[in-house]
Design a protein with these regions (language model features):
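Short glycine-rich, Thr/Ser-proximal phosphate-binding strand/loop in the N-terminal lobe
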Residues: 1-3, 160
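Short beta-strand-loop/turn "lid" adjacent to the catalytic site in phosphate-handling enzymes
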Residues: 16-61, 88-99
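General beta-strand structural signal in soluble alpha/beta enzymes
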Residues: 27-30, 80-86, 136-138, 156-158
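Glycine-rich phosphate-binding loop plus the immediately following alpha-helix
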Residues: 63-71, 83, 98-134, 142, ...
Length: 200
């Protein structure tokens, strides 16, 4: 995915040009990548974050967001680059980390940016604060994430990137474990082919 950096950066610049938006900004924000798990919030892009993004634990186009924002911001005077609520936001309660096997601790990669934005919008429409609400929010797209939001924190969410939870146009969803094990050792698919079938 990193090899698409220039291509995607140029798409951003082309979009600005097509819409006659001058390249003059006080700050630039990009979609956060799959860095180490962090609480929700806004983060300034720094060298450590860029290293984590280049060597991210998973491959996804979102890994380019902070890098592109940083590159574009570096061409302007006093212009910082940020990310907000990346997909690795981890605010899970301890009980939500329990799985049926100690060999597979729960990780969560979900649509945090979208879900938290919707939660804040809903709270505003209700005349209250996100931090005072209990919500269940679903992101329905190429992948599906479902999260429990409690007083401004997502205390449980599925790993949408790896296909956990409901199936969707680009994810197989949670599959029967026994059948999946049989498929893994059947010789029908390589590891990479199987991963592509689960999270295309």
């Amino acid at each position: 995915m990193i090899d698409q950096f220039e291509f995607r950066k140029n798409l951003v610049l082309q979009e600005l040009e097509n819409n006659k938006i001058p390249f003059s900004f006080d700050a630039i924000i990009g979609r956060g990548g799959l860095v180490k798990p962090i609480p929700g919030g806004v983060y300034e892009v720094n060298e450590a974050m860029k290293r984590d993004t280049v060597h991210a634990m998973r491959t996804h186009a979102c890994n380019l967001g902070g890098l592109i924002a940083s590159k574009l911001a570096s061409t302007l005077p006093n212009c910082p680059a940020f990310i907000a609520d990346p997909g690795v936001v981890d605010e899970l309660e301890d009980i939500a980390r329990i799985t049926g096997s100690p060999l597979m601790p729960k990780i969560t990669i979900w649509h945090a940016l979208n879900q938290k934005a919707i939660a804040r919008r809903f709270a505003k429409e209700q005349g209250t604060q996100y931090e005072s609400l209990d919500l269940i929010i679903c992101h329905l797209g190429g992948g599906i994430s479902v999260a429990v939001h409690h007083h401004g924190r997502a205390i449980d969410a599925n790993n949408a990137l790896d296909g956990e939870g409901p199936f969707s146009p680009e994810r197989a969803g949670t599959l029967p474990a026994g059948q999946l094990i049989d498929l893994c050792f059947s010789g029908q698919l390589t590891k990479d082919e199987l991963k592509k079938r689960i999270s295309g």
